[in-house]
Each structure stands twice: as structure tokens, then as C-alpha cells.
């Protein structure tokens, strides 16, 4: 099964989430391609798509929204998972889903949408964004919950390869029957 993981990220934090998800899917024995949304020319070779975007002011990055618009008909015929990254703080705020997420789930027939907390590193953003985040007292830091992200990746893998075919081994998932490294067990 061929899976596309495509992520729109402004500062790299959301892209890192996509890379972790792609790695989990590969470890489950799936063929995974990663690409920026604007670089994808077609979906003919993919059976499933994981589409993610950073969220700024409650909105997805333009290239992710454009991807969803451009390939809406193709996405509606595939297994699709959506995720957003952007709420920050402890607890992450805002707590509500990005406004367009539920509409996208419905329009694309996506299996699910998940929101994950993000990261704010003021050294990586522009002067205007820095001023706004300071004025709004937005906390700086990395608030991503890697355990929750990996668990969701495991769920996607199980959906694609079958729940009885995926087992956790040494912190990664492998297709059942895969050989364990020397000294390991499945």
C-alpha cells in the first residue's frame, strides 16, 4: 500500500510531526512518500493520504488548503487522515479545532482529524509575529505531545495494515511476523 504524507509547515515543527508519522507507517511495512503539498502533482500512485498543516490565527497554511481544494475529488476516493498543529501553551490554547477542519473532514470524507499542540520559537519567526506573540503573552516552547502523535500514527498504521498485523517492538511498530533484531522479541 502506498501512502502520501504531505505537510504544510512554516517553521518546521509541523513537518517534524509528519516525519514521525511517516516513519511509523514505514515501520509498519507501508510504502511512504513525503512531500510538501505544493510539490504533489497527482495522487494516482497513492492509496492513502495523511495531510497536515500548521495553524496560524485559526487557519491552515495556504498550501495545505490549496492541496485539499486541488485534489478534493481524488482525496474523496482514498483513505485520508488530517492533522493540525498549532495550539501552544500548557494546556495548549486554543482548545477548539481549527474552524475549517470539520468542513474538510466532511468534504474529503476523511477518516479523522487530530489537533496537536505546536512549538513557538521566537528566534524562528519574523519581527511582526514576534511582536504579536509577545503582546498576546503567547508562551514560548515546544508543546508537542510526541506520545500522542506516535499513538495516532500507530492507529493509522493499524487501520491500513490491519490491527492484528501490527505489533509494537522496541518503541516502533512492525508488521506481525517481522524478524526482531538480535536479542529482541516480537
PLM ranges: what are they?
Residues 6, 35-37, 83, 116:
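Conserved beta-strand termini and adjacent loop/short-helix elements that scaffold enzyme active sites
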Residues 28-40:
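A short beta-strand-loop structural module common to alpha/beta enzyme folds
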Residues 16, 24, 28, 56-186:
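FMN-binding flavodoxin-like domain, especially the glycine-rich phosphate-binding loop
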Residues 8-12, 37, 54, 58:
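Short, surface-exposed acidic/glycine-rich loop or hinge patches that mediate macromolecular interfaces
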